[in-house]
Design a protein with these regions (language model features):
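Short catalytic/signature loops enriched in Gly
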Residues: 9-75, 86-91, 310-343
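Conserved ABC transporter NBD signature motif
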Residues: 139-147, 160
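A short, surface-exposed alpha-helical micro-motif characterized by mixed small hydrophobic
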Residues: 289-291
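Helix-to-loop junction immediately C-terminal to a conserved catalytic motif
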Residues: 131
Length: 343
């Protein structure tokens, strides 16, 4: 509740006096260079790292029954999806919006593939198609060589659904407010029958809570008792509970301030390194995308315009729309004696 600093905008952002202000500014994602980790903001209660686990000998690190498939882990091929905006008995009178237009890309095991674009570009729609929440009008989604769009029964889909989990933009709306955190995380474990007994489930949930930096005592609380950043940690713990191979992160930090965002993004980086996770990372925030992704796809109005390695996209974009996006990106170069540098 204390006002630690105030003054001219250029002075406060370019040459701050208070350590907290400096720390807060350092947490803003860099757009000019890629860093291994995001600087954390000190002076706040949530600024801590996750508890380390020996994942090689831990349940989280145990491999699932993977098929012998050497191609890309995920392939999206010519996916089209349209939504009806005006229905009618007559086809000629129906109106549609094209949410996805012949979208195709591959995601390789262990990489982070980013989808970026303005609001309404169709990037979240593609994520939901991959997760099986939407059925495309045409095209297919292949996971380890299996066409997910051809699977009709729940019995066929369940083993593959376990290997793909989503982290949503708003963690609070993805949780049952009447359930305790322990049961929220344990729910997918019980649903997929991944443990032999409840004692084993309890140990796994406690380990997951420790691993995302909350501690096992968080399990006895309800979602409303946590901050936005803490709830996102809970969402990540729940997503990890099935030991997925693919983590779909749909704007996971867009509702968080930069201090908490840095913690969550570092957590995702650590989890990917330790568990060899493959990630599909969706965001409209170009600096965040640059820091997180190995390759990036640019979407506009349901169409995938370009797929490039991260550094190539930011230094030599190919499509005119990509060039426009990069040119409009605010470039905050941080603290200097000359003051704020915004391009």
């Amino acid at each position: 509740g204390d006002l630690v600093e105030f003054g001219n905008t250029a002075k406060v952002l370019g040459d701050p006096d208070h350590p907290y202000t400096r720390s807060l500014i350092s947490a803003v994602p860099r757009s000019d260079v890629k860093l291994d980790r995001f600087p954390l903001v000190s002076y706040i209660e949530e600024a801590h790292e996750m508890e380390p686990l020996d994942v090689k000998n831990h349940w989280l690190g145990q491999s699932q029954d993977h098929r012998d498939y050497t191609g890309s882990l995920l392939t999206v091929e010519n996916v089209n999806l349209r939504f009806t905006t005006k229905d009618s008995l007559f086809e000629s009178r129906r109106e549609y919006v094209q949410a996805s237009n012949n979208v195709s890309f591959e995601v390789f095991e262990g990489e982070t593939f980013g989808l970026v674009g303005e609001s309404g570009s169709g990037k979240s729609t593609i994520a939901r198609v991959i997760a099986g929440l939407y059925q495309p009008n045409s095209g297919k989604v292949t996971f380890e060589g299996i066409d997910l769009t051809s699977l009709k029964s729940e019995k066929e889909r369940r083993p593959l659904r376990r290997q793909m989990q989503m982290v949503f933009q708003n963690p609070y709306t993805s949780m049952n407010p009447r359930m305790k955190i322990f049961d929220i995380i344990a729910e997918p474990i019980r649903f997929h029958k991944l443990t032999r007994n409840e004692n084993e489930t309890r140990q796994i949930v406690h380990d997951l809570l420790d691993h995302v930096g909350l501690g096992k005592m968080a399990g006895v609380k309800y979602p409303h008792e946590f901050s936005g950043g803490q709830r996102q940690r809970i969402s990540i713990a729940r997503a990890l509970a099935t030991r997925p191979r693919l983590l779909i992160c749909d704007e996971p930090t867009s509702a968080l301030d930069v201090s908490v965002q840095a913690q969550i993004l570092n957590l995702l980086k650590d989890l990917q390194d330790e568990l060899n996770l493959t990630m599909l990372f969706i965001s409209h925030d170009l600096p965040v995308i640059r820091q997180m992704c190995d390759r990036i796809g640019v979407m506009q109005m349901g169409t995938l315009l370009e797929v490039s390695p991260t550094e190539q996209l930011f230094t030599a974009p190919q499509h005119e729309y990509s060039k426009q996006l990069i040119s409009l990106m605010p470039e905050f170069k941080g603290m200097s004696q000359e003051g704020l540098k915004l391009a």
